C-alpha cells in the first residue's frame, strides 16, 4: 500500500511539473538575437526573429526589449500563433528611420495582424515624424502620406499598457477590426505642428476600453470611426488637439454605424473641439446612437459641444450638403468649464435626418466669465437640471 501511495504521489508531482513547465513563459531578449541599442543599427530582423520564436511556441512568451534605443524599419508581426499569450515588455525606445521617405508610403510602421492575446507593456515609440510634417507644410500632396506608428488589425484580446508614442508621421495608434482591447496609461505627444496625427483611432471594432491616458496631438485625441460599438473611454486628458470625435461618419454610401459609446471623466485643455460628432454632408446609411458624454471639463475649448453634419473638406462630393447619417440618443451630462468662442453648444444637424433624443443635463459652459450661447439646426431633445448656455433644443 505504501508503495502505491508513493507512486501516486510521484505521479502527481510529475504531472504538476509538466503543467508548470507548459505554463511558464519563455523569454526572448532581442539583444541576444542581434538587436543593437545604438539607435542606428537596423534591428528589424532581430525583432522578427523573437516574434517567430514566440509565435511558434506552445508556451506563453515574453519578447524583452532592454533599455536603449533600437532602430526599426516598417515591420509586421503576423499570426495566428500557437499560443495566445505573447507579451512585448519594452524597457527602451523604438525609433523609426529619420528619413521619412523610408517608411512614408507604408501604411504602418509597427503592425500586428491576425493575432490573439498580445500585450504591449511599457516603452517609447518614436515615429520621427517632424521632417514629414515640414514637408507637408511646404509641398503638400507631393510628400508621402506617412505611416501610422502602431497598427492592429483583425485581432482579439489585446492589452496596451504604459506605452508612449512620440512624433508619429500619421496616426499614433489605429485599432481596426478588433474584439476586446484594453489601452491603459497611454501617452501621446508631439513637438510642433503635426497634421493628421490622431492619437488613437478606433473603427470596425467592439469591446475597446481606453483608460487613464494623456494625449497631445495635431488632430483628434481619440477618433471613432464607422463600425465601432461598446467603446468605453475614461480618465483621458486631451490637449492640444481636436478633441474626442465620433467621425467623420458617412463618407461611404453603405457604412456601418457607431453605437454604445461612453466617454466619461475627461479633460480638454486648449483644444479645437471638446465632444464632437461629425458626418459628411452626403447620402449614407450610417448612424450614431446610444452615446453618453459624462463628467467632462473644458478649459478654453473652441467648440466644447458640437455636432457637425455638414463636414465636407474642399467642398467636393457633397451634393446639397445633406447628410444621411442618423444621430440619436446622445446624452451630455455634467459638462462644465470655459469656451474660447461665444457659441459653446452647437448642433448643426442634417435637414433630411434631424438629430433626435439629444439630452443636456447639468451643463455649465461660460465664455469670458459670461454666459455663452447655443445654436441649433434640425435638432430635437430635452434638458434637465441647470443648463448654461440656455438650451436651443
From Swiss-Prot:
Glycan attachment points: 260
N-terminal signal peptide: 1-23
Top-level enzyme category: hydrolase
Active site: 219, 242
Bridged cysteine pairs (disulfide): 221-238, 349-355, 376-392
Compartment(s): Secreted; Secreted, Cell wall
InterPro entries: Glyco_hydro_28 (IPR000743), PbH1 (IPR006626), Pectin_lyas_fold (IPR012334), Pectin_lyase_fold/virulence (IPR011050)
Keyword terms: Cell wall, Cell wall biogenesis/degradation, Disulfide bond, Fruit ripening, Glycoprotein, Glycosidase, Hydrolase, Repeat, Secreted, Signal
Keyword field contains Secreted: yes
GO molecular function per UniProt: polygalacturonase activity
PbH1 repeat placement: 115-136, 178-204, 205-226, 228-248, 258-279, 288-309
Enzyme Commission designation: 3.2.1.15
Annotated GO biological process: carbohydrate metabolic process; cell wall organization; fruit ripening
Catalyzed chemical reaction(s): (1,4-alpha-D-galacturonosyl)n+m + H2O = (1,4-alpha-D-galacturonosyl)n + (1,4-alpha-D-galacturonosyl)m
GO cellular component: extracellular region
Family designation: Belongs to the glycosyl hydrolase 28 family.
Protein role: Acts in concert with the pectinesterase, in the ripening process. Is involved in cell wall metabolism, specifically in polyuronide degradation.
Protein name: Polygalacturonase
Lineage: Eukaryota, Viridiplantae, Streptophyta, Embryophyta, Tracheophyta
